[in-house]
Amino acid sequence: MNLITDIIIAVAGVGVGVAAGYVIRKNIAEAAIGSAEAQAKKIIDEATKAAEAKKREAVLEAKEEILKMKNEVEREHRERRQELQRLERRLLSKEETLDRKIESFERKEEQLAKKEQEIENLRQSLEETLQKELAELERISGLSTEEARELLLKQVEEEVQQEMALLIKEIETKAKEEAEKRAREIITLAIQRCAADHAAETTVTVVALPNDEMKGRIIGREGRNIRTFESLTGVDLIIDDTPEAVILSGFDPIRREIARRALEKLIQDGRIHPARIEEMVERATKEVEQDIREAGEQAAFEVNVHGLHPEIIKLLGRLKFRTSYGQNILKHSIEVAHLAGLMAAELGADVALAKRAGLLHDIGKAVDHEVEGSHVEIGVELAKKYREHPEVLHAIATHHGDEEPKTVEAVLVQAADAISAARPGARRETLEAYLKRLEKLEGIANEFEGVEKSYAIQAGRELRILVKPEKIDDLASVRLAREIAKKIEEEVEYPGQIKVTVIRETRAVDYAK
């Protein structure tokens, strides 16, 4: 019973406690809500006041900005209005000026029309007067208008030709002076730095004997030794009354050299019979081939030309045994290479190319007696075969003037070839060829109309021409000299240059009686 009572009391106590707690909490919550509402109201009031202040400031700023923009717009408007007023005034001024100019042009146009009419009237008057004068001139002179025009044109043409001849002479004189001066300087420098000797042309070789008894041993029994020797070498062995000497004769200098060496070895050995002759000729042939190769290599080394084909080097070596008008062709080629290289250096051209072309320019002469064609054509084919540079081919093809040189190096090779050939002592020609050249020079000059006589003097290096003064005047003599020189260049082969001098002499003779 007490337990139940205690439980009831406890439950009642808890209920009273809960009710009391609820009441207390409600009071506290209501007090807190009242305080929060007061605080919120205070914040709202402050925010409202701040917003009102910001609003007033924004309105003031907006009004100021609007006022500022309004003032700016009004200022721009005033400026534009003023600018438009200025433009309007300028436009009015230009319109007034244009009106005045139009009026002036109209007045000038009227004046021009009057002048044109006056000129037309004057032209018609002059035309009528001219026709009358022409008719009168035709009546007086007996010439028609066309005849008078032709006569006038002929006179003008003669005057122009005279002036042209004088101008050409003046230009040629100046050009020759400048060209000769520069060429003389270049050639002098090149020649001073290049020295070369020359060899005399010959078709025989003399071999000395220790005694005349050796002649019989060379001939052999019934001449078998001499027949064997000649058949193996292709050279004639001449044994005559010349004491202690025999003569080897042949146009091929390489064969002649092989024969000389073989014969000297046979003489030194003393054993001369067909088998020994064959052995010595074979040995001499190998020696000469070795000499040819060494001569070609030495020539290329001397002029500092590299990269030559071995066959080209052999062909160069063969030139050691060839001559032209007494001049050794290999030495001539080396000399041309040196001269072309020196002149190329002076002119700023390709020195290596000039030397290479100069060294190979006569390469065709190594086999021209074995292959058909000129040495120029053969040289071009050989150089092309062994893959030489196209400009080297061009220089070889043009060095005798068969083609027009198109490169500086080709011109230099042509000039160096002429210089080397014309050098005193470098070449000699047969009397027959010399006389034919002189006759050819005089014959060319005598072919021209107005030539009275011609003389080739100074060993064919100058041609003097006497003309008929009644047919050739002073200006025509200038043209005649140039035409004769051009024809000589086309038809005559000669070393160096030939001076063509035209002499016109007028004599007046009378007798006192």
Swiss-Prot record:
Endoribonuclease that initiates mRNA decay. GO terms for molecular function: RNA binding; RNA endonuclease activity. The chain crosses the membrane at residues 4-24. Belongs to the RNase Y family. Residues 329-422 form the HD domain. It is found in: Cell membrane. It is an enzyme of class 3 (hydrolase). This is Ribonuclease Y. One of its GO terms (cellular component) is plasma membrane. Keywords: Cell membrane, Endonuclease, Hydrolase, Membrane, Nuclease, RNA-binding, Transmembrane, Transmembrane helix.
